[in-house]
């Protein structure tokens, strides 16, 4: 997950027998809707033990994911230590197949997929 400080959640009691959770918007708006309404209320009132949703409408290029929670106090510690140059160096030294595409679009990728989620 994004910074290593996230978890995906669902309501185990709402899962039908033999159903495999897909983590989709349809599930969140369907069988998991009561759970996500409860969770939203907890987040909005500061009763979520530091967990929040970062993939929300209007933030960055990652589609909203109600099930994806970030532990904000821990994520912020990592964000404070984030280094563009260190990340770029990792890609430069890597054997990843799309390295040139990543490096050529590096500033755009940071602006669309990294920095919007620093909250």
Q: Which positions does each model-derived feature cover?
A:
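Cell-envelope/glycan interface and biosynthesis
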Residues: 1-119
